Amino acid sequence: MALAVRISTLTVAVTAAALLAGCERPPVDAVQRGYRGTGMQHIVNPRTLAEQIPTQQAPVATPVADNSGPRANQVFQNVKVLGHLSVAEFTRQMAAITEWVAPTEGCNYCHTENLADDSKYQKVVSRRMLEMTQKVNTQWTQHVAATGVTCYTCHRGNPVPKEIWFTAVPQNKRADFIGNLDGQNQAAKVVGLTSLPYDPFTTFLKEETNVRVYGTTALPTGTSKADIKQAEKTYGLMMHFSGALGVNCTYCHNTNGFGSWDNAAPQRATAWYGIRMARDLNNNFMEGLTKTFPAHRLGPTGDVAKINCSTCHQGAYKPLYGAQMAKDYPGLKPAPAAAAASAVEAAPVDAAASAAPVATVATAAK
């Protein structure tokens, strides 16, 4: 009898330990972000925050160089993106990129002895990434505001950013008895180790799939086309948001009504633009580089590395806690004439997008 009691006690203890293994131990800090008593709180684990702070520090910028004198494209050959800078500022920008992206490898990571040579794929990719950065800093200010981004925002001293994603490998169904997992039930890290669909990125950050699944009526109306699988993918994406930014649901949503834009936090509109920015960058910049990258840089299905929220945020609600690095590097915005042309071309799209978060149907989840 005593042995049975001991075994039962041990079983209960082991089960309890297993159930609590995924929980954070107290204490945690709560920051009120809405009206009292409504649960609008931001939960912060001070121990996790202490570990994160050193990784979110922006490097000190060197003083901006003299902008007088000949332009870089007048002195150097094959300077296609940063040619509008002075020679001094161009040299400063190149030194900064080396420190941000390849501090160990140095200039040779992208260049041969002939600096004008484009034989290294790294140089071709970096040129396109500079154009991408310039676009983000001028045409996606609804998401990055005046803070902008630099190469360091994503790379953090690594030639390949740590936080990237590839299309998930399809299930190998060589034997019918294993069943069809339907892209979920794998406890993937990207969806918080849950059974949710483990590739929400292809659906929402590459394809133009609507994230909206939340209803605003007590009973079904028959007008919603969302099904359970789409709802699960949406929640998978939300789990990614939470981990990527180190926040809980109430950072963007009012839990009184997830579908309400009027009662949501301002960050929800910022996230709405962020979703569309990620799609733009993945489809118009990353996908076009698929054939440029060597095979060992591609994913298991042969696709190119792509961007999600973690690529920039890396666990912080604002990348580098909002450090304004871009303002110190004029080369990370296009030449004035090109910037003006881009702004005029993008104006109709931006005008329509500006109204979208508040003017569309109130069933949006993000």
From Swiss-Prot:
Signal peptide: 1-22
CDD domains assigned to the protein according to its UniProt record, in alphabetical order: CytoC_RC
Pfam families: CytoC_RC (PF02276)
Name the UniProt record assigns to this protein: Photosynthetic reaction center cytochrome c subunit
Name of encoding gene: pufC
Lipid-attached positions, S-diacylglycerol cysteine: C23
Quaternary structure note: Component of the photosynthetic reaction center composed of protein subunits L (PufL), M (PufM), H (PuhA) and cytochrome C (PufC). The reaction center interacts with light-harvesting antenna complex LH1.
Lipid attachment, kind N-palmitoyl cysteine: C23
